[in-house]
A protein has these predicted regions:
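Eukaryotic intrinsically disordered, low-complexity regulatory linkers and tails enriched in Ser/Thr/Pro
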Residues: 1-22, 145-150
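Intrinsic, low-complexity N-terminal interaction/targeting segments
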Residues: 15-23, 41, 77-107, 115-116, ...
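Short, well-structured hydrophobic secondary-structure segments
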Residues: 23-75
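Short linear functional motifs in flexible/disordered or boundary regions
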Residues: 29, 54, 83-84, 129
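Short, well-ordered loop/turn elements at secondary-structure boundaries
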Residues: 35-36, 101, 110
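Short, surface-exposed linear patches
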Residues: 63-66, 88-90, 94-97, 128-132, ...
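Mixed-charge, glycine-accented linear interaction segment located at domain edges/termini
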Residues: 108-150
Length: 150
């Protein structure tokens, strides 16, 4: 598997990043909000959906970082920032434009958790940080996406 590195400057770019982040696991301790820098950085373990397809599927994960710049506010719904050991399952990342070029980025987690970012403009980056490792199973829980969107 080749390392991924994507930059998102619009909704279409973010949709590509969201696809690669479906079913990534995130420890609450790995969510870093820097209000003075207007930056949110998330360390996560993303599932490699491309390796899970084909005649000989392999289930792998890779450590990655997701970074958002120009973040004016970050709010949590059903995510306890004090619960540092909790592990969240990322289902999707969405962008809703408000005052162009600004808008709201939503990171939707299974169980209804949401991180809501108010951004001056969409500026995000996803980058793999190291080698992959194998895992035993492919993630499966489609109904949670509807719950998270509420």
């Amino acid at each position: 598997m080749q390392s991924l590195k994507f930059v998102a400057l619009d909704e279409e770019d973010l949709a590509i990043i969201s696809t690669h982040l479906q079913d990534a696991t995130v420890k609450v301790a790995d969510v870093l909000w820097r209000p003075q820098e207007k930056r949110l950085v998330i360390g996560l373990d993303r599932f490699d959906w491309l390796s899970a397809e084909g005649d000989k599927p392999e289930f792998r994960r890779c450590r990655a970082a997701l970074r958002f710049e120009r973040v004016a506010a970050c709010k949590c719904k059903q995510v306890n920032p004090a619960g540092k050991a909790a592990v969240l399952n990322l289902l999707a990342v969405e962008f809703e434009p408000t005052d162009t070029p600004g808008g709201v980025v939503k990171l939707l987690f299974s169980g209804g958790g949401v991180l809501r970012l108010e951004v001056e403009c969409l500026e995000a980056e996803l980058a793999d940080l190291g080698p992959t490792w194998t895992v035993d199973m492919r993630p499966a829980h489609v109904a949670d996406v509807l719950d998270a969107r509420g």
